[in-house]
Design a protein with these regions (language model features):
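Outer-membrane beta-barrel porins/channels
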Residues: 1-166
Length: 166
């Protein structure tokens, strides 16, 4: 990961960061695959599962914060997540202990995603700070390609909170 921060003035800061695409080896483990046979029902098959070339995407973030008053700060950042290069397909292989292999290709066809995040913080006292934010994102998943193993990425959400300094 690479990043930089620059203080434009006593009240305004700018930052940028780039996270590189992951380089993770194939994920492997033990699994039970359940086959369903007509008239027999469920047949558990013990074996090994491998998820091939599953990677996390590169990400670029540019943001700024500005202290409007000593108590009140506003922030904004824009992110670009490069899903397209890592989430075209999910490749799964299963090798049953009793023999036999199964290779599955799960099409995902993700698009790159742009995210805008806005936030604010207000210090009620040296101890208490109120916070709020909003996030707006383009949809990375194409309609009809949502696969339950991969969580959907919310395109809009709001958050509120507080902190207490000890």
């Amino acid at each position: 990961r690479l990043g930089l921060a620059y203080q434009l003035s006593s009240a305004t800061r700018f930052g940028a960061a780039y996270s590189f695409r992951s380089r993770i080896s194939d994920m492997e483990g033990d699994a039970t695959l359940t086959a369903i046979a007509d008239g027999i029902g469920q047949i558990p098959l013990e074996g090994k599962i491998k998820i091939r070339d599953f990677q996390m995407p590169a990400k670029l973030v540019v943001g700024a914060s500005h202290r409007v008053t000593p108590q009140w700060m506003v922030t904004a950042d824009v992110s670009r997540v490069f899903w397209k290069e890592v989430m075209k397909d999910i490749k799964v292989a299963f090798e049953a202990n009793a023999g036999g292999n199964l290779n599955i290709l799960l099409p995902q066809d993700y698009r790159d995603q742009t995210i805008l995040a806005l936030g604010t913080a207000y210090a009620l006292s040296p101890e208490w700070t109120l916070r709020a934010g909003a996030r707006f994102a383009s949809q990375a998943l194409r309609k009809g390609t949502l696969f339950a193993v991969i969580p959907a990425i919310p395109t809009k959400h709001l958050s509120v909170g507080f902190s207490y300094a000890v």
